[in-house]
Amino acid sequence: MQHVFIIGSRGLPAKYGGFETFVEELVSHQQSDQIKYHVAQLSENETGKHLTYKTADVFEIKKRNFGAANVIFYDRDAIVYAIKYIKSNHITNPIFYVLGNTLGAFIGHYMKLIHKIGGMLFVNPDGLEWQRSKWIKPIQLYLKYSEKKMAEHADLIISDNQGIEDYLKTEYGSIASKVIAYGTNNLATVPGVDKPCLDEHGIQVGAYYLVVGRFVPENNYEAIIRDFMVSSTAHDLVIITNHLGDPYFEKLRQLTNFDQDKRIKFVGTVYDKEQLTAIRKHAFAYIHGHAVGGTNPGLLEAMSATDLNLVFDVSFNRNVALESALFWQIGRLTEIMSQAENLEPKKVAILAQKARQIIAEKYTWGKIVGQYEELFLNES
C-alpha cells in the first residue's frame, strides 16, 4: 500500500478554491486500491482527530492565531503530525505531497525529517503566487524565496502547466520536475438548466460576453473593461465575481467609469454549478483575463462549456487553449471582439470542437487522477 499525505489544502469536502477541488477530485476519482490518501484539514478542533471521507483518511490540524503566518504553521504542524502518525503506525515509504510554496523558507529542516523516515517530498508550486498584486512587497519576497527553496529541496516538483515548469527550470536550473495538469468535468454533457438566471439584470441569452474569476487586478478587469467600453458591440459584459465589499471595486469604478456604460453588468457570485454552467453555455463568448498562474480551472470550464473563448495571451493560457481560442493583448481586446463578432458560425463551431477535444484528451479528472496514481505508485 502506498500512503500519500496531502498537505496544504483546507481539507475535505471541498468548500473553497483550486487545491481543495483538486484533492476532492483526486479522492473521488480514485482508481487504484493500492493507494491510501491522508489529507490534512484545517480545524478549530484539537490536532489529531481523524475522519473518513470516501476512501481518504482526513486528519485535523488545529488552527493557530498568527494572522497571515497561519498558513505557514498549518503546513508545518501537518507535516510534524503526519511524521508522528507514520512512525506510530509503522508506515513505510510515505509520499508527502505539499500544495503550495508557503513553507518553502523552512522546508530544508522538514525535508530531512521526511527522508529520515524513508519518505519523499513532492511539491505543487501553485503557479507564480509571489507575482500576485494582492501581496505587499515583503510577502512577495518571502514567497519568491520560498519558491526557490522548494525547488532546491523537493524530490519532485509537479507543475500543472508546461509554462510553470519552463519558468522553474529557467529560474533554478536542473530540478526534478513533472507536468500533470489540473482537471475539469466535461460540462458540454452536463444538462444544467434551460435558461440562466440573468433575467433580473436584463441580459439576453447569447447576447453577452462573460467574465468569471476572482476579483483581483491580475485577472485584468481594468484592461477588459477599458477595451469593452470603447467597443461598439451591442452585447453586454457580464462579470461574475466576488466584488461586493471589495475596495478594488470602487477603485476600478474611479479608473474606468464603468458605471456610465449600461452594458457592463456586475452580477456578483453564482455558486450553483448548474446555473453557472448554463450561464457559460449561453454566453456569446467568454473573456479570460488571468495573467498569473498555471492551468486555470475557469479556462478549462470555459473551454468545456462556451463555444467561443477570448483568452489573454500568456504562455500558461496558450499551453492550455492552443488553437481553440482567440488570443488578446492589453489594448487589443476591442479588435479581437470585432473579429469574434464577424466569425462565421461554422468557424465558431470548429473552435468549440477543438476546445472540447482538448478537454477530452488532456484535462478530464479521470485522466488527471490516472496520471497521479501512476506517479505515486511508480516514483516512490
Residue ranges of each PLM-predicted region?
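Acidic donor-binding loop of glycosyltransferase active sites
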Residues: 278-294, 307-308
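A short, active-site helix/loop in glycosyltransferases that binds the activated sugar's phosphate group
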Residues: 151-179, 184-188, 372
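An aromatic- and histidine-rich active-site surface loop
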Residues: 72-83, 93-126, 294
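Conserved donor-binding/catalytic core segment of Leloir-type glycosyltransferases
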Residues: 5-7, 200-219, 225-232, 237-238
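Glycosyltransferase donor-sugar binding loop
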Residues: 45, 184-185, 212, 236-251, ...
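N-terminal strand-loop element at the rim of the active site
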Residues: 7-15, 29-68, 163-171, 242-248
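Membrane-proximal helix-turn-helix segments that form the acceptor-binding/catalytic region
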Residues: 139-157
